[in-house]
């Protein structure tokens, strides 16, 4: 499913604070280039165990790779949410594959946000995500012990 980089809509959310990243399709060109190892390591940490306010039905598969020898495709069904100043970047976890395998170069603002973002699931991460007037804020504390949960507004 294609969404232009930095658009205000993606598969799992939309709004003035949303910025889509890495929703690529073979039918549309995308920016290519090199990214730093520091950024790749930071993005990998975020995509390994991303916070998930919604579970999407079905996988987002890479349209650029042929099926593997077992007939399966490269893909994933999770998304990564990166809060930044005034915006939340939302990307499929496949964004890491696009960078490493296909040379995709995300916008510089996303790169800076990933480098600045606290680890997924930490108190600092949840506090940054709470800044947004979004439906998913109520899911920030799911799975936390009752004493650590914030009351709903």
Label for each model-derived stretch:
Residues 1-153:
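Alpha-helical interaction/linker modules in multidomain eukaryotic proteins
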